[in-house]
Design a protein with these regions (language model features):
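AAA+ P-loop NTPase catalytic core and its hallmark functional loops
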Residues: 1-238, 243, 247, 255-262, ...
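C-terminal alpha-helical "lid" subdomain
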Residues: 250, 254-309, 562-629
Length: 634
């Protein structure tokens, strides 16, 4: 028998089937990592299941991948959630495609037992304890009775190892402590966060091309930012669960390697993008900028954004991103207005795309980026697949399920991919919306998809035992609105930490709004009047000058303004003023419940549009503007 030494522990290398993957790992053995590995390895050698507990980003799964990569042992990992059922792990019967019989498909736990593999129960405390107890014989005595199938007993083959991972219940959505009658069968190992010295040692090992002073600077920024969050100095009013750790630091280092390891401007810019930009409140941003500037020695120069498309490549400042449909990319860039806030937003998106990061676009409810969605999700020319989540949905709704064939015969069924599975197979851009409303039962199912594994395990009825992998060109976008109150659910900081958060800009400056409107409308009084009335209506609604009797204030967002513009486009006639007033009523005043308030807002609308001449050349100018745009905007 062959052996390998891991953290000074001699571990056997066992024979295994080659049909399951062995995940690579770049874990660096520091002193604390070595100690944690020993805490894991000795119970493993004794055949005792291990439960790893620790904060997001401390490397719980990385530890297992590291051990198994050295001993060449495949790992089957299943992301638990509140929707997990025993058959997801154990297996189930499915009808043959010809409808003339049934076949049994093993679940990942059954496969791990019968093949002698490692099984990782990821985020185990998201699952109800009564579900976990269905396979208690596995972690108690290393066997499983297939009650859902033939009833036979599957004994764990030599090499089988059961590992659970979980975040602490404190500070993580949907987590509850596992009862003692479950945990007593495990060797529970708490995985400590890395010390500053260990962070430096790890980063230096992984990124030897980066200067030591740069690594020390960003570690200090990360630690101070995390300390400020925990003390409530920043992020408190946001109601979001911010978190900075080694994963954030690795993102930063990857970006420096991509965009300029020795360029101080790049080093400062990426620090701002990762440690200042995610915060909503201006005072939080100011504190973070001050921290970053103090580390980098003064004010940080803002470089104007420049971009063009050539040779199937998007050149955007110092970024170069392949486009799979050059004509579509050029068309999108020509179809949407790009004032400075949008350019700054796009620069952050392109940075994350080139660095192959998952992107979380966050926005205020009245600043929904829906109107600009294709501009940042489809610029690479790859087809977009939307996965819309909501409360009450089941995992099968997005992953897939067995369904009757087109003939409708109940005895003939086939596996039908859900939108998430379909998009992975086809290599599409994946846009996951409704993250804030879906709850942990759906969101946490995507853990493997959004971390280093970049894969999704399908249920047994799919007939596929190997996880399906994201392609190189796939990008995962998440979209969520800001949390408005503590009673509103949000994503956990564990899930957030797998994404790069980018805030969609708040388009509220009158000059910016005029620039957006002047992209579609002739410059002058009309776009100026529309922008100013929009901001006035927003101000009155926010101050409750209108809607004071309502439980909820009126909301007027960028969507109202652009739909108003579209109305003028669609019904453009010689009397542009009347069309504009009608559009303003449709998208602003008609929703006002109080007749007096509605009348007053209509009076303001007519006042703001009083400068638009009743009969003018504006009609012809709008028609000419429409002809010059690449796509018809009506």
């Amino acid at each position: 028998m062959d052996f390998v030494t891991i953290a000074d522990v001699k571990v056997p290398v066992l024979p295994h089937s080659n049909k399951f993957p062995v995940f690579p790992s770049s874990l660096v053995e520091t002193d604390s990592v070595k100690q944690t590995l020993q805490k894991i390895l000795y119970p493993m050698l004794e055949g005792i299941p291990v439960l790893l507990v620790g904060d997001a980003g401390v490397g719980k799964n990385a530890l297992i991948y590291y051990i198994n990569s050295l001993r060449k042992q495949p790992t089957l990992r299943f992301s638990f959630n509140e929707d997990t059922l025993p058959e997801d792990l154990i297996g189930s019967y499915r009808i043959l495609l010809d409808g003339k019989g049934f076949t049994w498909s093993n679940g990942p736990l059954t496969n791990a037992l019968s093949e002698g593999l490692s099984f990782v129960a990821d985020e185990m405390n998201l699952c109800a304890p009564n579900i976990i107890k269905r396979f208690s014989s596995v972690y108690e005595s290393t066997y499983l009775d297939l009650l859902e199938g033939s009833g036979e007993r599957v004994n764990g083959k030599t090499g089988f190892w059961f590992i659970g991972t979980q975040n602490p219940s404190e500070g993580f959505e949907g987590r509850k402590p596992l009862p003692f009658d479950i945990t007593k069968h495990f060797a529970v190992v708490y995985v400590d966060p890395y010390s500053p010295d260990e962070m430096f040692y790890i980063l230096k090992k992984l990124y030897p091309m980066l200067a030591e002073d740069v690594l020390k600077q960003i570690i200090r920024i990360s630690l101070e930012s995390e300390a400020r969050i925990k003390s409530g100095e920043i992020g408190k009013g946001d109601l979001e669960k911010y978190h900075f750790n080694l994963r954030t630091l690795q993102k930063y280092c990857n970006r420096l390697v991509l965009f300029g390891a020795k360029d101080k401007t790049v080093a400062a810019r990426e620090a701002l993008y990762l440690f200042e930009e995610p915060f909503r409140k201006k005072e939080d941003k100011a504190k973070q900028r001050e921290l970053i500037e103090s580390e980098f020695g003064g004010g940080i120069k803002v470089v104007p954004t420049k971009g063009y498309v050539q040779g199937s490549t998007i050149f955007w400042n110092d970024k170069e991103i392949k486009t799979w449909d050059e004509k579509k990319t050029i068309s999108l860039l020509s179809t949407y207005p790009t004032p400075e806030p949008i350019l700054h937003f796009l620069d952050q998106v392109f940075t994350a795309i080139q660095a192959k990061e998952n992107i979380l676009v966050e926005y205020r409810e009245d600043q929904d980026p829906q109107e600009f969605l294709p501009l940042f999700t489809e610029l690479t020319g790859i087809e977009l697949e939307s996965v819309m989540l909501s409360k009450g949905m089941h995992t099968s709704d997005v992953v897939g399920a067995l369904k009757p064939t087109e003939e409708g015969n109940i005895e003939s069924v086939t596996w039908v991919d859900g939108p998430l599975t379909r998009s992975i197979r086809k290599g599409h851009i994946i846009l996951i919306s409704g993250l804030e409303s879906a709850g942990a039962e759906l969101v946490e199912k995507m853990n493997m998809l959004t971390d280093d594994a970049r894969s999704l395990t399908l249920p047994p009825e799919s007939g596929e035992y190997l996880p399906i992998q994201l392609t190189e060109k796939s990008i995962v976008f998440g979209m969520k609105s800001f949390r408005a109150s503590k009673s509103v659910t949000s994503i956990s900081r564990a899930f957030r930490n797998r994404f790069t958060p980018i805030l969609f800009p708040e388009l509220e400056d009158v000059k910016v709004l005029e620039e957006i409107l002047e992209f579609y409308l002739p410059e002058g009084v009309l776009p100026r009047s529309l922008a100013r009335f929009h901001l006035k209506a927003k101000e009155l609604a926010e101050k409750r000058t209108i809607g004071s009797a309502n439980l909820m204030p009126y909301r007027f967002g960028i969507a109202n303004l652009l739909k108003w513009k579209n109305h003028i486009y669609r019904y453009n006639q010689t009397d542009v003023k009347d069309i504009a007033i009608r559009g303003g009523k449709i998208y602003y005043t008609n929703q006002i419940a109080d007749p007096k308030e509605r009348k007053e807002l209509e009076r303001l609308l007519e006042g703001f549009l009083s400068g638009v001449e009743v009969v003018s050349t504006l009609f012809e100018e709008i028609e000419e503007k429409k002809k010059r745009l690449p796509l018809n905007q009506d």
